[in-house]
Amino acid sequence: MRNPNTETVTMRILARFLLSASDLSHFPAPSVPEIAFLGRSNVGKSSLINTLLGSKLARTSNTPGRTRSINFYEVRRAGQPRPELLFADLPGYGYAKISREISAEWARFVNPYLHQRPSLALCLALIDSNIPPQESDAQLLEFLSAQRRPHAIVATKCDRLSGNRLQQAMRAFGQAYGGVPIVPFSTKTGAGKEELWQQIRAAQSQCPTI
């Protein structure tokens, strides 16, 4: 049975895949606020995007490192004639077998995107709530802070934890990651969906006109 609270956003959202870019020259021209989704390989970025959009636009895979480019999605509310947001699904990181390739890709086009993109309104760092704080995640958050990029943590797969264990995980994340806002999220139950949309809309409203 669907939760009506999670449908209030989904029914108003229309989205489409725009393009996939693995080079700066292929990025779409900045036009609307952009929301970047980042995280370790297999943390659930594509599944989270699909849950937010109420569709299956983003390809999901159990193979870590499948996303090797930045995938852009146009997002608008029903009734609006033009896109209001872009979602950017970035390549994952932190998986040993592909770490060298991913590192090269980050240096070539991901770091420049995060550093230079004028339309980037919010970076969502996805972290698996079922594992302890990781150094690679801490490094990402430090990088975003150094770049003065607005960012928040999305603690994925929270449905796998009991209430007490989830609270413990959130406390551990809060201590490890320096008080960055955290949204517990589940693609299975829809938990956190409304709160995350609130974060996105707030960032959208604060993004300078492009």
Which ranges hold each PLM region?
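Conserved G1/Walker A P-loop phosphate-binding module
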Residues: 2-95
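Canonical P-loop GTPase G-domain recognition
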Residues: 12-25, 160-210
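Short, glycine/charged-enriched secondary-structure capping and boundary segments
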Residues: 31-32, 52, 100-103, 138-142, ...
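Residue-level signal for inorganic ion chemistry
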Residues: 73, 156, 196
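Active-site glycine-centered loops adjacent to acidic/histidine catalytic or metal-binding residues
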Residues: 89, 156, 186
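Flexible beta-alpha connector loops of hexameric P-loop NTPases
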Residues: 93-103, 130, 159-162
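Amphipathic alpha-helical transducer elements in NTP-driven molecular machines
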Residues: 103-107, 190-193
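Conserved C-terminal guanine-recognition region of P-loop GTPase G domains, centered on the G4
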Residues: 108-181
